[in-house]
Swiss-Prot record:
Active site: C142 (acyl-thioester intermediate), H235 (proton acceptor), E237
The protein's name: Homoserine O-acetyltransferase
One Pfam family hit: HTS
Reaction(s) catalysed by this chain's protein: L-homoserine + acetyl-CoA = O-acetyl-L-homoserine + CoA
NCBIfam families in UniProt: metA (TIGR01001)
Binding site for substrate: K163, S192, R249
Residues the record marks as site: Important for acyl-CoA specificity: E111
Keywords per UniProt: Acyltransferase, Amino-acid biosynthesis, Cytoplasm, Methionine biosynthesis, Transferase
The gene coding this protein: metAA
Principal place of residence: cytoplasm
Positions of the record's site feature: Important for substrate specificity: S192
PANTHER family, per the entry: HOMOSERINE O-SUCCINYLTRANSFERASE (PTHR20919:SF0)
Organism: Bacillus subtilis (strain 168)
């Protein structure tokens, strides 16, 4: 089945060129199928890039999936055209009365700030509280994961002496969880962050299970025991060249602490190697199937 997105969304042409089945809203309306309704709170600066990355990972599902894009009303994005936001995005006041099968809260390059210093923190708290009753399962990514752990469970983020930057090997710790079904014992995930999770606080929360971790990058995948909250500290949605673009950006800024991303380039080459795409797709498919589709009633009350 296809993903159902607006006809003129820029990601549509990219996904179709990759032979991902995309259906516009008018055609989907005439199919007698209840689509999975996913809302994406996109906090990343390059919104079109993030839209494409996430839709690509969810586009191989046998389910029909309909997407709604959300931005905070208390923050004005600087890197995306107003016309794009007006056409494809909505705000919380317009959807708070609705229910969604799944929700994705993306990362944001604001980890240097305390959560309470983030301009849209109060609105984000309201959205996360709303998600507990109006969303079947919520997937938090990178800073979104840190924000979710802090809000829901009081787990704080900690500043790291060096940026966690590269593609790191991870081990599956809980092999019987549905979210990691089909995973190899070792798999790879890109990371790009200056902060980590307070492990002492995390391990003291009985409602959470740690599913995967890396010796170099720390805990990666955490899930609440009721499967409603999923926390992902890395960026498996990243394109092959995303870390390279971030590295070149930091070099241009003349940051003194810039180091090349670890385990990212082919040996003896400056070309990156994508070793995470298959597991990234499997992770998103497992979440959509086991935590969203199988847990949501056909008709919500």
């Amino acid at each position: 089945m296809p993903i159902n997105i607006p006809t003129h969304l820029p990601a549509k042409q990219v996904l179709e060129s990759e032979h991902i089945f995309v259906m516009d809203e008018s055609r989907a309306f005439h199919q007698d199928i209840r689509p999975q309704k996913i809302i994406i709170l996109n906090l990343m600066p390059k919104k079109i890039q993030t839209e494409t990355q996430l839709l690509r990972l969810l586009g191989n599902s046998p389910l029909q999936v309909h997407f709604t894009f959300l931005i905070p009303s208390t923050h004005t994005p600087k890197n995306t055209a107003r016309e794009h936001l007006d056409e494809f995005y909505t705000t919380f006041s317009n959807i708070r009365h609705k229910r969604f099968d799944g929700m994705i809260i993306t990362g944001a390059p604001i980890e240097h700030l305390a959560f309470e210093e983030v301009s849209y923190w109060e609105e984000l708290k309201e959205i996360m509280e709303w998600s507990k009753t109006n969303v079947t399962s919520t997937l938090h990514i990178c800073w979104g994961a840190q924000a979710g752990l802090y809000y829901h469970y009081g787990v704080e983020k900690i500043q790291m002496p060096k940026k966690i930057f590269g593609v790191f090997e991870h081990t599956v710790l809980s092999k019987h969880e549905r979210l990691v079904r089909g995973f190899d014992e070792l798999y790879y995930v890109p990371h790009s962050r200056h902060t980590d999770i307070n492990m002492e606080q995390l391990q003291a929360v009985p409602e959470l299970n740690i599913l995967t971790a890396s010796k170099e990058a720390g805990v990666c995948l955490i899930v609440s025991k009721d499967e409603k909250q999923v926390f992902l500290t890395g960026h498996p949605e990243y394109d092959t060249n995303t870390l390279l673009q971030e590295y070149e950006r930091d070099l241009e800024r003349n940051l003194s602490t810039v180091e090349a991303p670890k385990h990212y380039f082919a040996k003896g080459s400056n070309e990156p190697v994508n070793r995470w795409k298959a597991h990234a797709t499997l992770l998103f498919m497992n979440w959509l199937n086991y935590y969203v589709y199988q847990e949501t009633p056909y008709e919500w009350d």
